[in-house]
A protein has these predicted regions:
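Small-residue-biased structural context
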Residues: 1-236
Length: 236
């Protein structure tokens, strides 16, 4: 029988909840559907019906939705199963593509609109800062692909010995700092010629990207990492 996952910080979702109600409660959850390649429309189906239709684990989807809606949510290890590992890797890979192909270019496009109103020096400084920021994030994604994802997918029996889970630690804090730095630069230092409306829109995109990357980091730390440990213990 379907039941709510019992955890202190669980967002108020249940498998019987209608997809429309889920999205209405937290519209940013739409990005999860994109990353999981879930088909629209949903009609009047529930979370459990949608997961059955799309071939996703209900429990895993509930964890992802709860972590996205409530950044303090931490999945209980008793609900984690080794067979979830492959699906969470695909979700994280899709998240990397979502950032690289959608969020980062979308933010860059708004930056270019701001730069049209700036002097040459401001254009050069801000463009270089954002390019470095983007490059750092993409390099981190590529490192995770080489040292974590490809090892798990390509040679699962070697996960315990080969997977470098230390990559989940410091780089995420650095990405967060860089997100705050570029927001501060836009907020404090751009000349008045850059319209306030454009600066506000740019800041909204930067903060949305930062917050989504924080959620992404939480998924890696509190879902992927313990799943790797659980999988490793079951294959020894």
């Amino acid at each position: 029988m379907n039941k709510k996952i019992s955890t202190a910080h669980l967002a108020s979702f249940s498998p019987e909840m209608k997809i429309f109600e889920l999205v209405e409660s937290s519209p940013s959850l739409l990005s999860i559907f994109s990353r999981l390649n879930i088909r629209l429309p949903f009609g009047d189906i529930s979370i459990s019906e949608m997961c059955e239709r799309e071939g996703h684990s209900v429990e895993l989807f509930m964890m992802l939705a709860s972590m996205h809606a409530d950044t303090s949510f931490r999945p209980s290890k008793e609900h984690l199963k080794p067979e979830m590992l492959g699906e969470i890797i695909e979700y994280l890979r899709a998240s990397h593509r979502y950032y690289a192909e959608h969020m980062l270019p979308h933010t860059a496009a708004h930056l270019e609109k701001i730069l049209q109103h700036c002097d040459t020096l401001s254009q050069s400084v801000l463009r270089r800062f954002y390019d470095d920021y983007t490059r750092y994030i993409i390099d981190h994604f590529n490192e995770e692909e080489r040292n974590i994802f490809s090892i798990i997918v390509g040679c699962a029996e070697e996960v315990a010995r080969e997977c470098n889970c230390n990559l989940f630690d410091m780089p995420h804090a650095d990405i967060d700092d860089r997100s705050n730095d570029i927001a501060s630069l836009i907020f404090k230092n751009l000349p008045e010629e850059a319209p306030t409306s454009l600066r506000c829109t740019m800041l909204e995109h930067i903060y949305a990207l930062r917050d989504d990357l924080r959620r992404h980091s939480n998924v890696e730390m509190y879902l992927l990492r313990p799943l790797i440990e659980i999988y490793s213990n079951t294959t020894r």
